[in-house]
Amino acid sequence: MCERSLYRAGYVGSLLNLQSPDSFYFSNLRPNGGQLAALPPISYPRGALPWATTPASCAPAQPAGATAFGSFSQPYLAGSGPLGLQPLGAKDRPEEQAKFYTPDVAAGPEERGRSRPPFAPESSLVPGTAGLKSTKYDYAGVGRAAPGSAALLEGTPCAAGFKDDAKGPLNLNMTVQAAGVASCLRPSLPDGLPWGAAPGRARKKRKPYTKQQIAELENEFLLNEFINRQKRKELSNRLNLSDQQVKIWFQNRRMKKKRVVLREQALALY
């Protein structure tokens, strides 16, 4: 502990009714801060006052590398050396000290002084990029086709028109006629078939039942809702209908009767 002595100059001077050095320092100053012209200026530095000095025993110990307030610290240099994570007192264990090295520290001083050459692409990549650029903008190569594809185009009837167009200069803004494209895309149909009907998927046109056929079928349905194969064959021969038509008509008639019964039951509940 540091104890201030009672025999210091400032304390003894106050007991003996002596003027304090502050009076010499502030006596020639006006209240507004200006000095009187009649009195000479007295410079009494604060550092020379006896009570302003602190004994060495009371002063805190400062490290040798510490700087005073207001002074500038050393600027950071990227290649100055490794930075340690341990405090200053841990210099006795340099092998355990974790260090961070900047990229310039690992290299030698002569290597750091050399200027790095600018990046240049490899020569092997340059021809590839040139080839890509040439193929990207080479519109004249669109008209040229492979030998195999040319042989395939010769067999189709509309391939001749494409080959004639490919011989001339290629126009990117040209519009192809829709009729010509549709004629080449859809297969050629034989004469006599309607447009849109496939050759092997021909479907019979629906033939409605006549009033006489419907009356005969209704009379048979009133007698028996389910008919056997023999009765169905007799009806088909008599009404000039196929066996499948008679079978489907009875199925549809039973479903119609079922819907009517369900509707009547629903109305009876309300």
Swiss-Prot record:
Location of this chain's protein in the cell: Nucleus
Coiled coil regions in record: none
Keyword annotations from UniProtKB, A to Z: Developmental protein, DNA-binding, Homeobox, Nucleus, Transcription, Transcription regulation
Record protein name field: Homeobox protein Hox-D12
DNA-binding region: 202-261
Region of interest: Disordered: 103-127
Naturally occurring in which organism (per UniProt): Carollia perspicillata
Family named by the database record: Belongs to the Abd-B homeobox family.
Gene designation: HOXD12
A Pfam family recorded for this sequence: Homeodomain
Entry-linked InterPro entries: HD (IPR001356), HD_metazoa (IPR020479), Homeobox_CS (IPR017970), Homeodomain-like_sf (IPR009057)
Keyword Ligase (UniProt): no
GO terms, molecular function: DNA-binding transcription factor activity, RNA polymerase II-specific; sequence-specific double-stranded DNA binding
Gene Ontology terms: cellular component: nucleus
Record's function text: Sequence-specific transcription factor which is part of a developmental regulatory system that provides cells with specific positional identities on the anterior-posterior axis.
Cross-referenced Gene3D superfamilies: Homeodomain-like
